[in-house]
Amino acid sequence: MRRILAAAMACLALAVATAAGADRPWVFLVAWLGLGSALSYDWPLKSTVLSPLPYAVSFACLPAFVVLVAGHSVPAWLVLAGGLLGFGAHFANVVPDMADDEATGVRGLPHRLGADGALAVSAGALLAVTALLIFGPPGPPRAFGAAAGAVAVVVLLLGAFVGRRSAARHWAFRGVIGVALVDVALLIAGGALQ
């Protein structure tokens, strides 16, 4: 049933992409690239050191697709922020399932770094996204951006401080997820997709 649902969703995504990109080939290409990248995760990249690549490419394609559909050019900082968000999300997403994944033979890059390494990489990537979303758009940073950046740093530091012990590692994970939520709020509230 899961495969049928995935196939149906892929067909729907391709239909939307085809309709949206009928007169603009870049829209079509970005949609196909994002979908193809996402599908490449399960095979062959999930258990390799390249496991973050599909996340980075697909997350970068999503805001690019939205901006292209609206008829605008896509700023490089937005593509980079999307890619880093996907990269960081992959490392964070693996942490809760790490033991189960390793038991089934999944050994992507985050698994090879271990839970602490994966959380550190995720935190670094997500803080880079925060900086890109604050300083990437033209003009001076908005007050909301500065406040969101401060919140991201505080949430991450709190999560790291409380999560120093392996028994409380879930707090470090929650801190990383908190920064990801701040980044999504920055992206939307900053009007980057408008």
Listing of model-derived features with the role each one plays in the protein:
Residues 1-10, 50-55, 115-125, 146, ...:
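Select subsegments of transmembrane alpha-helices in polytopic membrane proteins
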Residues 1-31, 106-141:
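Multi-pass membrane catalytic core of lipid/isoprenoid biosynthesis enzymes
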Residues 1-74:
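Intramembrane alpha-helical segments
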Residues 36-49, 94-98, 156-166:
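C-terminal ends of transmembrane helices
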Residues 53-70, 110-115, 173-190:
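Small-residue-rich segments of transmembrane alpha-helices in multi-pass membrane proteins
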Residues 74-87:
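Alpha-helical transmembrane segments
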Residues 85-110:
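Acidic (Asp/Glu-rich) catalytic motifs at the cytosolic membrane interface
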Residues 140-194:
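Extended hydrophobic alpha-helices typical of membrane-associated regions
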